[in-house]
């Protein structure tokens, strides 16, 4: 691959915030000991905020956003990875503090990477992305609490925000794990979608309006 490649660059000069796809070279990439050819990235809520400069999440400009990506190692100074390894990155404030995945080439700390499982394509990894990772960790936490603290199997699980990215994947995972999933959503047009994912019951979000916000999460 040429030393020049395309990346989405966001910049802030005074009150002027810009987004532009530009050609850059590898000298632009600041941090990391592993260089990756990015195959896929995705779009998360935090990405949307960063792309609109919401929440002032990015402190240094110019910047390359994109909190997730999958790809193939081009160069490595990290003993854990070698050229040709297929890898996944999610989290570690990449795309926020460190340059992210909205680029044809990325350079990151090898400790942020994991090797891609052989039964998962790079595209599938990014279809799941941060939302899938978060949902799975939540499901594991429910299972752990069930086994360690409750002493008996939990039957019913309530998923709020069920039609969103994290929520919809959580509905699918939890139903596959054998739980009766009660999906809360304010979008009636998503009812059939949630049923197809495995929700046993759909609850209108309005039923929770006015209730105390001091409810504790199970995870």
Spans of model-derived segments:
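Residues at the starts of beta-strands that form the adenosine-phosphate
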Residues: 6, 86, 180-181
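Cytochrome P450 core scaffold surrounding the K-helix E-X-X-R motif
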Residues: 46-52
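Surface-exposed amphipathic alpha-helices with a cationic face
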Residues: 167-176
């Amino acid at each position: 691959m040429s030393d020049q490649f395309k990346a989405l660059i966001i910049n802030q000069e005074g009150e002027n915030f810009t987004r532009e796809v530009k050609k850059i070279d590898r000298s632009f990439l600041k941090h990391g000991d592993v260089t990756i050819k990015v195959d896929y990235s995705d779009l998360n809520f935090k990405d949307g905020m960063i792309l609109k400069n919401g929440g002032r999440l990015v402190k240094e400009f110019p910047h390359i956003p994109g909190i997730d990506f999958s790809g193939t190692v081009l160069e490595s100074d990290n003993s854990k990875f070698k050229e040709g390894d297929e890898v996944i990155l999610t989290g570690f404030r990449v795309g926020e503090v460190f340059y992210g995945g909205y680029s044809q080439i990325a350079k990151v700390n090898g400790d942020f990477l994991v090797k891609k499982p052989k039964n998962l394509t790079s595209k599938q990894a990014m279809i799941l992305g941060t939302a899938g990772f978060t949902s799975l960790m939540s499901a594991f936490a429910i299972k752990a609490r069930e086994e360690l603290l409750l002493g008996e199997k939990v039957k019913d699980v309530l998923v709020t925000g069920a039609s969103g990215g994290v929520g919809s994947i959580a509905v699918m995972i939890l139903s596959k794990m054998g739980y009766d999933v009660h999906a809360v959503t304010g979008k009636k047009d998503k009812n059939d979608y949630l049923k197809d994912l495995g929700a046993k019951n759909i609850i209108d979000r309005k039923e929770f309006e006015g209730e105390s916000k001091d409810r504790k999460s199970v995870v």
